[in-house]
Curated annotation (Swiss-Prot):
One of its GO terms (cellular component) is riboflavin synthase complex. It comes from Chromobacterium violaceum (strain ATCC 12472 / DSM 30191 / JCM 1249 / CCUG 213 / NBRC 12614 / NCIMB 9131 / NCTC 9757 / MK). It catalyses: (2S)-2-hydroxy-3-oxobutyl phosphate + 5-amino-6-(D-ribitylamino)uracil = 6,7-dimethyl-8-(1-D-ribityl)lumazine + phosphate + 2 H2O + H(+). Catalyzes the formation of 6,7-dimethyl-8-ribityllumazine by condensation of 5-amino-6-(D-ribitylamino)uracil with 3,4-dihydroxy-2-butanone 4-phosphate. This is the penultimate step in the biosynthesis of riboflavin. 5-amino-6-(D-ribitylamino)uracil binds at F26, A60, L61, E62, A84, V85, I86, N117. The lineage of its organism: Bacteria, Pseudomonadati, Pseudomonadota, Betaproteobacteria, Neisseriales. This is 6,7-dimethyl-8-ribityllumazine synthase. The keyword Transferase applies. InterPro entries: LS (IPR034964), LS/RS (IPR002180), LS/RS_sf (IPR036467). The gene is ribH. (2S)-2-hydroxy-3-oxobutyl phosphate binds at E89, T90, R131. Its EC number is 2.5.1.78.
């Protein structure tokens, strides 16, 4: 039966793809690690530097608005959200984590565009530092794979 099913294989070729990145500046060292890993992976996947737009914002709560603006422009095949929310001693962590995550997801669904979410939510700086390189690269791969899948499915 599987032989009769049309299977769409993952496509990690970034050639010709336009990628928009919204990056929070709060927790700067972690965000820079995410950014550097994401850009390095996009380059490995064949995305040209001139096809990448990077916009920075104050914090994670501002990321969805910039993603929405990028999505509305119609200039991008996929978007990437980068940021770091590290738990403190107040309820603010939950608020920022939940709202930024929901906003990022909503942009993708509302504007029919793939969005890779690499806004880290961690208990401490050490966890963020361990995850930043892996998750930055993951976000790049997700953006490229989903952009290609999206194009294939849309015909």
């Amino acid at each position: 039966m599987l032989d009769a099913i049309q299977c769409i294989e993952p496509n990690f070729s970034g050639k010709g793809l336009k990628i928009g990145i919204a990056m929070a500046r709060f927790n700067t060292p972690v965000c820079h690690g995410l950014r550097d890993a994401c850009l390095a992976e996009l380059e490995k996947l064949g995305v040209a530097a001139g096809d990448i737009t990077l916009a920075t914002v104050p914090g994670a709560l501002e990321v969805p608005l910039v993603l929405q603006t990028m999505a509305k422009s119609g200039r991008f095949d996929a978007l990437v959200a980068l940021g770091a929310v590290i738990r403190g001693e107040t309820y603010h962590f939950e608020l920022v984590s939940n709202e930024s995550g929901a906003g990022v997801t909503r942009v993708g669904l509302d504007f029919d565009i793939p969005v890779a979410n690499a806004i880290l939510t961690t208990e401490n700086d050490e966890q963020a530092e361990v995850r930043m390189l892996e998750k930055g690269g993951d976000a790049a791969r997700v953006a490229v794979e989903m952009a290609n899948l999206h194009k294939t499915l849309r015909g």
